[in-house]
C-alpha cells in the first residue's frame, strides 16, 4: 500500500455475512466514490432486510480494495442500498473464487488463484474484515 498515497484510501470494517445475497454498502458510506448503474439496479432488484421490509438496489460503487496482509489491490463492486453497515456476501466471494473458513476466534478468505489468505476477525457473534477502499479506475470485479 505504500506506493499509493494514503489519503486516497478509506478504511472500512466489513461484516462477513453468509446470509447476504450481495456485497452491499450503505448509501452514506464512501460518498466520494460515485454510484454507477449495475445489472441489479437496472432490473429493479430489491433486498429483503431483517424486519421483512424491502429496500431498492441503487447501483454500485466500483472499488479497489486492500486487506490486511495483501500486496495488490483487488477489484470489488459494492451494491448500494439503505443498509446499516457494509456486508461482504460469502456467496459472492465464493463465486469469485474465494473459500471462506470461519472458526471460534476468526477465520479467513482464501483466494483459489493466489492462495492469499485474507484474515477475518470475530467480534462477539459477528465476523468482520478490516479493508481499505478507493474508487476503481477499472470496471467491476475481476
Q: What are the roles of these predicted feature ranges?
A:
Residues 24-25, 57, 64, 94:
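Basic, gly/Ser/Thr/Pro-rich low-complexity segments located predominantly at protein N termini
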Residues 39, 48-49, 112, 142:
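Short, intrinsically disordered/low-complexity patches at protein termini
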Residues 24, 48-50, 113, 137:
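Intrinsically disordered, low-complexity regions of eukaryotic proteins
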Residues 44-59:
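C-terminal reverse transcriptase regions that engage the nucleic-acid substrate
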Residues 2-47, 77-89:
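Aspartyl protease active-site motif detector
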Residues 63-142:
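Aspartic protease core domain of the pepsin/retropepsin superfamily
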Residues 7-9, 40, 56-58, 71, ...:
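Short solvent-exposed loop/turn micro-motifs enriched in small/polar/acidic residues
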Amino acid at each position: 500500500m505504500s506506493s499509493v498515497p494514503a489519503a486516497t484510501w478509506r478504511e472500512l470494517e466489513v461484516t462477513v455475512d453468509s446470509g447476504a445475497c450481495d456485497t452491499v454498502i450503505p448509501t452514506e458510506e464512501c460518498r466520494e466514490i460515485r454510484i454507477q448503474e449495475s445489472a441489479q439496479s437496472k432490473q429493479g432488484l430489491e433486498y429483503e432486510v431483517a424486519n421483512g421490509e424491502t429496500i431498492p438496489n441503487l447501483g454500485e460503487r466500483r472499488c479497489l480494495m486492500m486487506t490486511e496482509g495483501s500486496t495488490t489491490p483487488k477489484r470489488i463492486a459494492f451494491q448500494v442500498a439503505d443498509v446499516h453497515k457494509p456486508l461482504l456476501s460469502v456467496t459472492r466471494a465464493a463465486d469469485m473464487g474465494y473459500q471462506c473458513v470461519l472458526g471460534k476466534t476468526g477465520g479467513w478468505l482464501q483466494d483459489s488463484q493466489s492462495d492469499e489468505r485474507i484474515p477475518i476477525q470475530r467480534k462477539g457473534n459477528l465476523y468482520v474484515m478490516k479493508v481499505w477502499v478507493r474508487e476503481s479506475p477499472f470496471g467491476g470485479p475481476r
